C-alpha cells in the first residue's frame, strides 16, 4: 500500500510543479500584451532610418575631380571612373562614373575618403529590381536624390523605439515654448 501512496504523492507533486510552470509562463505572456507590435505593414508603413544610415550613394558630378580615391579605398574596387586628361587646363576631366549596387557592400569608405565630398550616403534602401543589370547606376542615376520618406503623405513612418517618441514629444514641447 505504501508504494501506491508514494506514487500518488509524487504524481501530485509533479502536477503542482507543472501547474506552477504553466502559471509562470502565463504571467510572462500577459506581461507582453501591453507592448506595441514589432511587425510593420511594409509598403504602407516604413521605419525612419537612423541619421548615419548607409543607403544608396548620391554622386555630384560637378564636384568630382576624378582622383580615383574612391576606387582605391573600396574593398572590392567597385566604382568605375572614366576620365581623360585635358591638356589645355592641365586637369583630369571626368567622363563617366558608375557604381554597381548589386555588388556594393555599402561600407561607406568611398564617401568617407572622398576629398571633395562629391559622394554621400542617402536613406534610400529600396533597390530591388527584376534584372540585376538595372542595379548598375551611372552618374545620371547616382545624381538623382531619393524621395524622402518624411515628405510622402501616403506612407506612415514608424519610429524604431518608444524612446524616440518620448524624445520627439519633449522636443515638440520645447519648440512651442521657444517659438512665439
Swiss-Prot record:
Cellular localization per UniProt: Plastid, Chloroplast thylakoid membrane
EC number: 7.1.1.-
GO terms, molecular function: 4 iron, 4 sulfur cluster binding; iron ion binding; NADH dehydrogenase (ubiquinone) activity; quinone binding
Cofactor section: [4Fe-4S] cluster
Comment on bound cofactor: Binds 2 [4Fe-4S] clusters per subunit.
One GO CC term on file: chloroplast thylakoid membrane
The keyword 4Fe-4S appears for this protein: yes
Residues bound to [4Fe-4S] cluster 1: 64, 67, 70, 114
Catalytic activity: a plastoquinone + NADH + (n+1) H(+)(in) = a plastoquinol + NAD(+) + n H(+)(out); a plastoquinone + NADPH + (n+1) H(+)(in) = a plastoquinol + NADP(+) + n H(+)(out)
InterPro entries in the cross-refs: 4Fe4S_Fe-S-bd (IPR017896), 4Fe4S_Fe_S_CS (IPR017900), NADH_quinone_OxRdtase_chainI (IPR010226), NDHI (IPR004497)
Binding site for [4Fe-4S] cluster 2: 74, 104, 107, 110
Membrane topology: Peripheral membrane protein
Keyword Iron included in the entry's annotation: yes
Assembly, per entry: NDH is composed of at least 16 different subunits, 5 of which are encoded in the nucleus.
HAMAP family noted in UniProt: NDH1_NuoI (MF_01351)
Family designation: Belongs to the complex I 23 kDa subunit family.
Database matches in NCBIfam families: ndhI (TIGR00403), NuoI (TIGR01971), PRK05888.1-3 (NF004537)
Protein name (Swiss-Prot/TrEMBL): NAD(P)H-quinone oxidoreductase subunit I, chloroplastic
Organism this protein belongs to: Zea mays
Gene encoding the protein: ndhI
Amino acid at each position: 500500500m505504501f508504494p501506491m501512496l508514494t506514487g500518488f504523492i509524487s504524481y501530485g507533486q509533479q502536477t503542482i510543479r507543472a501547474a506552477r510552470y504553466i502559471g509562470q509562463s502565463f504571467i510572462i505572456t500577459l506581461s507582453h500584451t501591453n507592448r506595441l507590435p514589432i511587425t510593420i505593414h511594409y509598403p504602407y508603413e516604413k521605419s525612419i532610418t537612423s541619421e548615419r544610415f548607409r543607403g544608396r550613394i548620391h554622386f555630384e558630378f560637378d564636384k568630382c575631380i576624378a582622383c580615383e580615391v574612391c576606387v582605391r579605398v573600396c574593398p572590392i574596387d567597385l566604382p568605375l571612373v572614366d576620365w581623360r586628361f585635358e591638356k589645355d587646363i592641365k586637369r583630369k576631366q571626368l567622363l563617366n562614373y558608375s557604381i554597381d549596387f548589386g555588388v556594393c557592400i555599402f561600407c561607406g569608405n568611398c564617401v568617407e575618403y572622398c576629398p571633395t565630398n562629391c559622394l554621400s550616403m542617402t536613406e534610400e534602401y529600396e533597390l530591388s529590381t527584376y534584372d540585376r543589370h538595372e542595379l548598375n547606376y551611372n552618374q545620371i542615376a547616382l545624381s538623382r536624390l531619393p524621395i524622402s520618406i518624411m515628405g510622402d503623405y501616403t506612407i506612415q513612418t514608424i519610429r524604431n523605439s518608444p524612446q524616440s517618441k518620448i524624445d520627439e514629444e519633449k522636443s515638440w514641447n520645447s519648440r512651442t515654448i521657444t517659438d512665439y
